[in-house]
Amino acid sequence: MNKNYKDTLLMPSTDFEMKANLATKESKIQQKWLDDQIYQLRLEKNQNNEQKILHDGPPYANGDIHVGHTMNKILKDVIVRRWLMQGYYSPFILGWDTHGLPIEHAVQSKLGQKEFFKLSVLERIEVCRDFAFNQVQKQKEQFSSLGLVTDFKVCYHTYDKQYEIDQLKVFAKMINEGLVYQDYKPIYWSWSSKSVLSDAEIEYKETKSPSIYVTFKTLDNEVIGKDVNLVIWTTTPWTLPSNLAISVHPELEYTLFEVNGQKYLVGSNLYEQLIAKFNFENPKVIQKLKGSSLDKIKYQHCLYDQITGIVVLGEHVSDSDGTGLVHTAPGFGLEDFIVCKKYGIDAYVPINDEGCFDQTVHDPELVGVFYDDANKLIAQKLEARNCLLSLNFINHQAAHDWRTKKPVIYRATKQWFINIKSIKNQLVENINTVKYPNERYAKRMLSMVAERSDWCISRQRTWGLPIPIIFDENHEPILDKELIDNTLRIMEAEGIKAWYEHDAKYFLTNKYDPRKTYYKESDILDVWFDSGTSFNVLKENGIKDKATIYFEGSDQYRGWFNSSMICATVLNKTAPYKELISHGFTLDEKGMKMSKSQGNVISPLTIIKNKGADILRLWAASIDYSNDHRIGNHIIEQNSEIYRKIRNSLFRYILGNLNDFDFKPLDQYQLSLADLLTINHVNKSFKKIDQAYLNYDYLEITKEVNQMVVELSAWYFELIKDSLYCNDENDPTRKAIQATLNYIFINSLFRIAPILVHTAEEAYSHYQATNKEKSVYLIDPPALFEIKTDLDLDQLATEFSKLKDDVYAEIEKLRKDKVLAKSNEAVVYLSKQYLDINKHLVKQLKTWLNVAEVHFTKNDQITVEKTDFSKCLRCWNYFKELSKNNNEVCQRCSELV
């Protein structure tokens, strides 16, 4: 007869394409979300439900988004989508950090520095605002290509008027609580930025520095006598012209010794080590004494005869390295500054904003010399004066400006500070209320607060929020609540520009004499203060509770996590977030930091253009984000392969086999044992995925999804093809299989949708169920099917899996030897170990193994041979006898053709 039986089969049919074409489709899907207002509809649907809020930490509004940005935003989007799909009210409000030096520098580069500074302050602010606005618009467009579940019209920017006013109200509260003060003390100074820097704006890089040992001779005293060489060690020779004291620890022991007619003093614990270092021969110990006995001994400066200093007592001194005596320049070190303050010694700072020695230095040869260049000249002078014992060079980690990448110095300047010490206990208490992934994160947050000094909040820049403080005629700040409140009222009514448009008297209240002279502060607030008050945005958008979670890079423990905690503790007496998680940094495929100079920068926009955002999203969900992680062409290709499995082996396979399904509830079908085993198996996967979502463990989710697809494809999806394609359309077994597939589809789709957002929407659009929602993102969570059976499905699955693996191993040998083309040609003789196999499996084995025959034997080994049965030309299975009515097909197929 040789009929074409293919036309009689119920083959899969769906318009859901095998080839994704994501780069083409994604923008259309995004536009449909906008047109249908899917995000707004979901929020409306959930509006009376419990709130869960992820507060978006604002990225800096400068330049194209990079792969680190995209990883961060994708994972945040996954969190929020999952919450929304579970029914929580979870608006996702994106933010941008828009003030600060990088924008100022970018505008200066664009206009030219001379032209920039020809502008008035208000004009400079306006051009910076315009630049920031354009950068935000560009980044919004780029972020939108990721398919984020947000409204880009409802965002926050730190230059927004209401944002700025809310920020100033936090500052005013700090003033009213006595936390704000002005002081002159050393802090990080960036000569390349001409501004102070916060701890969060510092990065450490390996640097080569001089390591020198220098002597200062004592003046006449009754403790150790005249002309004793006090030995100090320093890696900053350029600070020696500013030396005003030498610190010793009051409790440490010091050794006075003599070599070649010269007397020296060093810490006793370092004596032997230093003798060897300086190649001193036959030293003679004269005396050992406590540091406290050296207090206020005077000495001659190592460089200048007209300058003297004194020995001071400091608890910061150590005898683990150096000499046990510490060169002390209060203008260039915080500990130096603190110890000298106790002795009434003021800071001396002969270095200007550009990092060069100014006219106040005691040495005319140093005037105008850059501090780092002065090291060589100073070393030469020390050697000429016989004050240089040793000079070497060492590599060590030194502080650098994170934006300009140039070294920074500690330098005393007059700045505004927040007194952290007085609120540390409250900070620790609030930090301990936060939930962390593990104790390591909690300790990290606590250590940042424990180690934190007072927060310097003033910056010498233009583009930012002004510090609204007025000074009296003596240049003393007026920290008066009534005056501060009045200033804020004016700025709220007229805008921040009022601070620059009016003189100081405009802001005075009636109690101040307008005939006197007043001054305005010209500094602006630290940008970390800007972003640190962003929690106010939630209240402005009708969110009553604090954020559920903050999720940013691990560098934010000393940055945004920290500044937010401080600001919220002052304003609300509570932490700004309930949970805190962080991620590492994105490296290239070799584990190297990306940089333009290395040529290893991977653009997320290129990946989106070539592969699609869903591939990038899958990558972000498949990394261990808690640590540094990698990306590269090979890694993206691996994720593309996993994506293809999910798209085709799961979504497309199922959709193709649901084209004639009736979509009734699962319990209305006669589910087979294979169906039940499969439902039981996928339920385990779904529960693991649900738990992983609770733990923010997306790597576990992608692993579980991939494993589930592999396992379904390896057995159940192969097993059911015969019934799906060859049985009657309305056959109960076939309908039960379709019901099982439908169950797997909607539950898988629901769980994969927060990650593969465009693909999930596309798949849902081809899903033919009745009473569908407009979007997959509007569906309710599907309930897990509760299997009611007395059978131990787990045990059955384990038993069958073991048997299947053993049988397939033997079949594979014959396939390699070309004896078998397919497994359904095999006759299987089971070994004696399977004689006691579960009775429920016995009658299923031929079908479940997809073989021609199964025989039980008492043999020691499983054996396989090729069947001599006849092949049905319709279903391609092998039978001892074909249909009597049609000897080309089996009995079942004969009845259907």
Swiss-Prot record:
Reaction equations catalysed: tRNA(Ile) + L-isoleucine + ATP = L-isoleucyl-tRNA(Ile) + AMP + diphosphate
List of residues binding Zn(2+): C872, C875, C890, C893
Major localization listed first in the record, in broad terms: cytoplasm
Cofactors (names): Zn(2+)
Pfam families in the cross-refs: Anticodon_1, tRNA-synt_1, zf-FPG_IleRS
Gene3D superfamilies: 1.10.730.20, HUPs (3.40.50.620), Valyl/Leucyl/Isoleucyl-tRNA synthetase, editing domain (3.90.740.10)
UniProt entry tagged with the keyword Membrane: no
Protein origin, superkingdom: Bacteria
Subcellular location: Cytoplasm
Gene Ontology CC entries for this record: cytosol
A GO BP entry: isoleucyl-tRNA aminoacylation
Residues that bind ATP: K596
Residues involved in L-isoleucyl-5'-AMP binding: E552
InterPro entries reported in the protein's UniProt record: aa-tRNA-synth_I_CS, aa-tRNA-synth_Ia, Anticodon_Ile_BEm, Ile-tRNA-ligase, Ile-tRNA-ligase_type1, Ile-tRNA_ligase, M/V/L/I-tRNA-synth_anticd-bd, Rossmann-like_a/b/a_fold
SUPFAM superfamilies: Anticodon-binding domain of a subclass of class I aminoacyl-tRNA synthetases, Nucleotidylyl transferase, ValRS/IleRS/LeuRS editing domain
NCBIfam families: ileS
Function summary: Catalyzes the attachment of isoleucine to tRNA(Ile). As IleRS can inadvertently accommodate and process structurally similar amino acids such as valine, to avoid such errors it has two additional distinct tRNA(Ile)-dependent editing activities. One activity is designated as 'pretransfer' editing and involves the hydrolysis of activated Val-AMP. The other activity is designated 'posttransfer' editing and involves deacylation of mischarged Val-tRNA(Ile).
Similarity comment: Belongs to the class-I aminoacyl-tRNA synthetase family. IleS type 1 subfamily.
Domain free text: IleRS has two distinct active sites: one for aminoacylation and one for editing. The misactivated valine is translocated from the active site to the editing site, which sterically excludes the correctly activated isoleucine. The single editing site contains two valyl binding pockets, one specific for each substrate (Val-AMP or Val-tRNA(Ile)).
Protein name: Isoleucine--tRNA ligase
Organism: Mycoplasmoides gallisepticum (strain R(low / passage 15 / clone 2))
Source organism phylogeny: Bacteria, Bacillati, Mycoplasmatota, Mycoplasmoidales, Mycoplasmoidaceae
